Curated annotation (Swiss-Prot):
CDD domains named in the record: SHMT
Oligomer and partners: Homodimer.
The entry's keywords: Amino-acid biosynthesis, Cytoplasm, One-carbon metabolism, Pyridoxal phosphate, Transferase
Functional note: Catalyzes the reversible interconversion of serine and glycine with tetrahydrofolate (THF) serving as the one-carbon carrier. This reaction serves as the major source of one-carbon groups required for the biosynthesis of purines, thymidylate, methionine, and other important biomolecules. Also exhibits THF-independent aldolase activity toward beta-hydroxyamino acids, producing glycine and aldehydes, via a retro-aldol mechanism.
GO MF annotations in UniProt: glycine hydroxymethyltransferase activity; pyridoxal phosphate binding
Name of the protein described by the UniProt record: Serine hydroxymethyltransferase 1
Binding site for (6S)-5,6,7,8-tetrahydrofolate: 117, 121-123, 349-351
Signal sequence, renumbered to the chain: none
Tree of life domain: Bacteria
Matching NCBIfam families: PRK00011.1 (NF000586)
Length: 415
C-alpha cells in the first residue's frame, strides 16, 4: 500500500503526475538522470530519522553505530571507484562541496581562476552572482572561437593572475578536459588544482574520460548526473592534510548533521557504478551523444566545438533569428526536455540565451541506443526548422510519446 497516498493525496497526486511526465517526455537535460529504485528506497529508509553530526567513530550523538557503517561503506566504495585515498560523502550538493573546498583552502579575497560561465563554466567557479565570485577575487578563462579550451592561453592567464586556486571542470563543455595539462598550469604558478567533475564523473569511473587523479589536489562531484545516484555532493583527495581541512570545512564549517539516508543512497549508487554493467552504460552514453551531434550537424545546426567527446552537445543559435529560450519552449511543447544555455560569444541575456544544452544520460538509462537517438535528433531538427509550427510540435509529441512508452523507467512514483 502507499502510505503517502493515504496520508497526503495532494503530494501523492503530484508524484504521480511527475512520474507521467518523466515517463512520457524525453528527458534530455544533460545534468539529469534516472536513478535506481534501490537508491530511492534507501533515501526513504529509517536513516531519515538519525542525527549523526561528526564523522564515523567521532560523532557528537549516541546511537550512531549503524550510521557509521553506512557512511564508512559509502567512503570505501567512493575511494575504490575513483582510485583516491580520502572521500567526504557528506556534502548535500555539488555547490556545497565546492563551497567547502574554498572554505578549507582559501581566505576571503584570495584569487580564484575558473571557467567563464558563458563559455561552459559553473556558477560556483567564480561567477559574480555566486558566493564564489563574491567572497573571493575571481578571474576567468574561456574557450577559443573553435569552442575548445586553449591550454597555452589558460597558462598565460594564470601567469598574469597568479591565482591561489585553479578550478577545472564545466557544466556545458562537450570536449574532454585534460587534467594533466591543468596540473602543469597550476604547478607553473604555484596554485592548487581543483577539479570539479560533476558532469563527467560517471564517464571517469568507467574509464571513458580522463581521471582527475593523480593530477588534482582536490576533486568534487555530484552523485547524480552521469553517476545516476541520489542528489548530493562529494569531495575527494589523496592529500591527508587537505582531507583534514575539508572535513573541518564541511563539519562544523558549513553543515551540521549529515543526511544519513542520502549517504546510504550514495553507497547504493556507488555499488552500481562499481558493477561490470556500468562500463557498458558509459560507453553507450558517449555513443548516443555522438550520433545526436552528428545528425544535428548534418541537419545544418552549429555545435559549439563542432561535436562532443562526452555526454552532451551544445547547440549555438548565434546565427539564427530564434533564441535558446525559444528552442527550449518549442522542444518542450514537442515532448523533449532540454535547457536554454549561454554559448561562447553570447549576445543575449542569461534568461534568453543563444543556445541549448542536450544530454544523453537519462535516455540511455532508459535503454535507448543509437537508433533511437538518430530518430530523436531528426525530430529535434524538424521542430527547430519550423520553430513556430505548434501543429508540428503536437504531432512530434505524439510520436515521441509512443517511443517513450517502449522504454519504461518506473512502474510506480514512490519507493
Amino acid at each position: 500500500m502507499s502510505f503517502l497516498k493515504e496520508f497526503d493525496k495532494d503530494i501523492f497526486d503530484l508524484c504521480e503526475k511527475e512520474l507521467e511526465r518523466q515517463s512520457n517526455h524525453l528527458e534530455m537535460i544533460a545534468s539529469e538522470n534516472f536513478t535506481l529504485p534501490a537508491v530511492m528506497e534507501a533515501m526513504g529508509s529509517v536513516f531519515t530519522n538519525k542525527y549523526a553530526e561528526g564523522y564515523p567513530a567521532k560523532r557528537y550523538y549516541g546511537g550512531c553505530e549503524y550510521a557509521d557503517g553506512v557512511e564508512q561503506l559509502a567512503i570505501d566504495r567512493a575511494c575504490k571507484l575513483f582510485g583516491c585515498n580520502y572521500a567526504n560523502v557528506q556534502p548535500h550538493s555539488g555547490s556545497q562541496a565546492n563551497a567547502a573546498v574554498y572554505a578549507a583552502l582559501l581566505k576571503a579575497g584570495d584569487k580564484l581562476l575558473g571557467m567563464d560561465l558563458s563559455h561552459g563554466g559553473h556558477l560556483t567557479h567564480g561567477s559574480k552572482p555566486s558566493f564564489s565570485g563574491q567572497n573571493y577575487s575571481s578571474f576567468t578563462y574561456g574557450v577559443e572561437l573553435d569552442g575548445r579550451m586553449n591550454y597555452d592561453k589558460i597558462l598565460e592567464i594564470a601567469k598574469a593572475v597568479q591565482p591561489k586556486i585553479i578550478v577545472c571542470g564545466a557544466s556545458a563543455y562537450a570536449r574532454e578536459i585534460d587534467f594533466k595539462k591543468f596540473r602543469e598550469i597550476a604547478d607553473a604558478v604555484g596554485a592548487i588544482m581543483f577539479a570539479d567533475i560533476a558532469h563527467v564523473a560517471g564517464l571517469v569511473v568507467a574509464g571513458e574520460h580522463m581521471s582527475p587523479f593523480p593530477h588534482a589536489h582536490v576533486v568534487t562531484t555530484t552523485t547524480h548526473k552521469t553517476l545516476a545516484g541520489p542528489r548530493g555532493g562529494m569531495i575527494m583527495t589523496n592529500d591527508e592534510d587537505i582531507a583534514k581541512k575539508i572535513n573541518s570545512a564541511i563539519f562544523p564549517g558549513i553543515q551540521g548533521g549529515p543526511l544519513v539516508h542520502v549517504i546510504a543512497a550514495k553507497a547504493v549508487g556507488f555499488k552500481y557504478n562499481l558493477s561490470a554493467e556500468w562500463k557498458d552504460y558509459a560507453v553507450q552514453v558517449k555513443a548516443n551523444a555522438k550520433i545526436l551531434g552528428e545528425v544535428l550537424v548534418k541537419r545544418g545546426y552549429d555545435l559549439v566545438s563542432g561535436g562532443t567527446d562526452n555526454h552532451l552537445v551544445l547547440l549555438s543559435f548565434l546565427n539564427r533569428d530564434f533564441s535558446g529560450k525559444d528552442a527550449d519552449i518549442a522542444l518542450g511543447n514537442a515532448g523533449i526536455t532540454v535547457n536554454k544555455n549561454t554559448v561562447p560569444g553570447e549576445t543575449r541575456s542569461p534568461f534568453v540565451t543563444s543556445g541549448i544544452r542536450i544530454g544523453s544520460p537519462a535516455l540511455t538509462s532508459r535503454g535507448m541506443k543509437e537508433r533511437e537517438f538518430e530518430f530523436i535528433a531528426n525530430k529535434i531538427a524538424d521542430v527547430l526548422d519550423d520553430i513556430n509550427n505548434t501543429k508540428l510540435q503536437e504531432s512530434v509529441k505524439k510520436e515521441l510519446k509512443e517511443l517513450a512508452q517502449k522504454f519504461v523507467i518506473y512502474n510506480q512514483s514512490t519507493y
